[in-house]
Design a protein with these regions (language model features):
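Hydrophobic, helix-rich cores of sensory/ligand-binding and other regulatory modules
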Residues: 1-178
């Protein structure tokens, strides 16, 4: 929090935060020349900033996974509204810049200390673009079930389960599960 204050990043004191990754898809077509390709990320970032400026408080920066967005959700906006704005950004980048942009949105968090985990969920959401498609918003809650806890086995139980699934009849599988 001190660093956010020090650098005047205005996302503190929100109800929750969302992280998103803006990924510019590689184009195989005869597109812009090399100089124009270098300018595309700057233009995409500018479009995102213009769309979100009047909607929510946010910070946007470059990271190893792409253009990263952290948005503050409070009483003046909503998570659903933000997802709609992100979808509009994808459409406008396609229309204006003629580039395909996919925006992956991670889980929301209510504590800033959870941002790194939420960022990882946005990276995970980006991994679904080959299944869901590109040029749109991919929200992690839409593609992954909400975790209810992990199934835990000890080594013996795990071996019994794997053996039953691989080699056993249906009755053996049911017996092993129960």
């Amino acid at each position: 929090e001190e660093k956010l204050k020090e650098y005047s990043v205005d996302i503190l004191h929100a109800k929750k935060w969302l992280t998103a990754l803006i990924h510019i898809e590689a184009e195989n077509a005869e597109g812009p020349n090399a100089l124009q390709k270098e300018l595309i990320p700057i233009s995409v970032r500018q479009i995102a900033e213009d769309h979100l400026r009047d909607y929510c408080r946010f910070t946007i920066f470059n990271s190893s996974a792409g253009i990263t967005l952290i948005a503050a959700i409070d009483e003046n906006n909503s998570q659903t509204g933000l997802l709609d704005h992100l979808g509009d950004i994808c459409k406008e980048c396609r229309r204006v810049l003629e580039v395909t942009v996919t925006i992956a949105v991670g889980h929301s968090c209510q504590k800033l200390s959870e941002l790194s985990r939420m960022y990882q969920s946005a990276v995970d959401a980006l991994g679904y673009r080959s299944i869901v498609g590109v040029g749109q918003t991919i929200y992690i809650n839409d593609v992954e079930p909400v975790s209810r806890g992990k199934l835990k086995f000890d080594n013996a139980d795990e071996n019994d389960f794997v053996t039953a699934v691989k080699f056993g009849p249906e009755e053996k599988i049911r017996e092993t599960i129960h």
